[in-house]
């Protein structure tokens, strides 16, 4: 979950949104440590970078991070995004100390906190903490039980759906502000409407993240998620196809645009409308350039992006340098510009380029028709979605420009 307050662009506010923050961070207080062993987790093997030790951010490092981030970022609102692994494994005392340090260094700035969790450790005490400190919590839930439990197991191989639903019900009952993050994978292909209806009954805010990964088989061990360029890399069996992802999102959209515009919020629809309206979207993957969201690991190492935690993308360490300087570094600025500059010509000439800007570099391991590299492997699916939603997005843009609610688009389906 990225570090904007609601992680969605509200349709009523789309015309009023300003520029994205100067820079943001995602912090990993326990690194990749987790109490689950989800098949598709792109972060679970990052522990190998740090010698497979049990990581935990020290209090000294926590204070350094909070001070540097608040004092180094130019925006008035500072959004802390706590991530993992499973960040709740850091414990409540750690997070209470973090809140104390935020108050110490806040000055006249506004502090926001978001946190992504699998829900397993959520209890009454955690809910009270979230509620008292105004956290926005992202809960990982892939859909109905058979979809969720296909790839989201605990470390003993047991399913997790019932425990996640218990956490969801507890957060609802205690008034915790949360949204739902769902992956779109091989098990959920063809079931977009079903998944949306299920999630719609649970929460008004949802995100759908496509899973496309490559693995290398290891004798006697689970497959290792690797770059598709690595020798012996094969597509992971849980990956969604481009067409499957596109159809999934079209099916979700058809349900949403008939009944739910303005009352239920789907991140992809919000960022698509933002680009239609010429407003910078709040999601880096759909902007022209990226690089505004660095990652701070448990030991203070800083990387260009959550999806690029590899030695070649390490920018430094906050115990030896300043976050703001790492953001302004040639390496990070070049990383952000490459999102735009490295795209193949076919991409830049596409009628839908202004809507996706090539999407996230993590998915750019395909080839254009002329053989140019860096093509997004989900391109076909995104084109399907953009074609399908085109008339509705145009109409919502017109409504917003006239000062009318975007929900008027639902009349098109009646």
Task: Write out the residue ranges for each language-model feature.
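N-terminal [4Fe-4S]-dependent radical SAM core
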Residues: 1-27, 45, 75
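Radical SAM/AdoMet-radical enzyme domain recognition
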Residues: 66-81, 90-226
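Radical SAM enzyme [4Fe-4S]-AdoMet core and its adjacent flexible, acidic
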Residues: 154-162, 169, 173-285, 289, ...
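Flexible mid-to-C-terminal extensions adjoining Fe-S/redox cofactors in radical SAM and related proteins
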Residues: 309-414
């Amino acid at each position: 979950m990225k570090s904007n307050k609601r992680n969605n662009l509200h349709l009523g506010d789309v015309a009023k949104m300003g520029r994205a923050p100067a820079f943001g961070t995602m912090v990993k207080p326990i690194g990749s440590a987790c109490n689950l062993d989800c098949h598709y987790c792109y972060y679970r093997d990052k522990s190998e970078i740090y010698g497979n030790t049990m990581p935990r951010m020290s209090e000294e490092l926590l204070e350094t991070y909070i001070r540097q981030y608040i004092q180094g970022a130019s925006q008035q609102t500072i959004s802390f995004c706590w991530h993992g692994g499973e960040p709740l494994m850091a414990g409540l005392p750690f997070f209470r100390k973090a809140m104390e340090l935020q108050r110490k260094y806040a000055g006249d700035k506004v502090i926001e906190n978001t946190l992504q969790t699998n829900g397993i450790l959520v209890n009454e005490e955690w809910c009270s903490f979230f509620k008292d400190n105004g956290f926005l919590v992202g809960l990982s839930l892939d859909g109905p039980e058979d979809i969720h439990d296909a790839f989201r197991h605990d470390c003993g191989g047991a399913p997790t759906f019932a425990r996640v639903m218990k956490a969801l019900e507890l957060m609802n009952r205690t008034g915790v502000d949360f949204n739902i993050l769902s992956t779109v994978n091989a098990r959920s292909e063809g079931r977009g409407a079903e998944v949306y209806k299920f999630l719609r009954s649970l929460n008004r805010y949802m995100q759908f993240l496509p899973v496309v990964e490559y693995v290398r088989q290891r004798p006697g061990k689970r497959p290792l998620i690797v770059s598709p360029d690595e020798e012996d890399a094969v597509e992971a069996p849980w990956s969604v196809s481009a067409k499957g992802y596109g159809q999934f999102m079209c099916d979700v959209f058809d349900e949403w645009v008939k009944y739910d515009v303005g009352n239920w919020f789907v991140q992809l629809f919000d960022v698509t409308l933002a680009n239609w309206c010429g407003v910078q979207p709040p999601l880096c993957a759909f902007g022209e350039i990226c690089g505004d969201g660095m990652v701070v690991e448990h030991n203070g190492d800083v990387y260009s992006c959550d999806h690029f935690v590899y030695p070649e993308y390490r920018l430094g360490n906050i115990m030896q340098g300043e976050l703001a300087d790492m953001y302004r570094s040639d390496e990070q600025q070049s990383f952000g510009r490459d999102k735009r500059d490295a795209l193949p010509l076919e991409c830049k000439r596409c009628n839908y380029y202004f809507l996706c800007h090539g999407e996230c570099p993590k998915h750019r391991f395909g080839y254009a028709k002329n053989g140019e590299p860096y093509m997004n492997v989900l391109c076909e699916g995104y084109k399907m979605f953009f074609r399908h939603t085109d008339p509705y997005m145009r109409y919502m843009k017109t409504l917003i420009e006239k000062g009318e609610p975007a929900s008027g688009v639902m009349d098109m389906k009646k």
